[in-house]
Amino acid sequence: MCDDSYDAVEEYYFNKSVAGISGQENWNKQLATQVYSRSLQPEILPTLKPLSCNKERANAGKRVSEEEQINGKRKRKD
């Protein structure tokens, strides 16, 4: 009994698609899983290094603020 609707090529591709995920699709699925798992982990940010400051400039700023407190006035910066 041979059924006219039976197609060997269709059965081959159907079995191939049902049998498992192809290599590329499997790789994409693994990559998506890795990206998702990384997104759940806290992000490690690089630590900021302190800026090297000029001591004279820092001291001058302190002097100006002390003078402002004493005089009660604020100097305009042009």
Swiss-Prot record:
Query: Compositional bias (Basic and acidic residues) spans?
Result: 56-66
> What did gene disruption experiments reveal?
Causes increased sensitivity to osmotic stress.
A Pfam family per the record:
DUF5137
**From its record, what is one biological process in GO terms?**
cellular response to osmotic stress
Know the name of this protein? Uncharacterized protein YJR107C-A
Q: What InterPro entries would the database entry show?
A: DUF5137
Task: List every stretch annotated Disordered.
Answer: 56-78
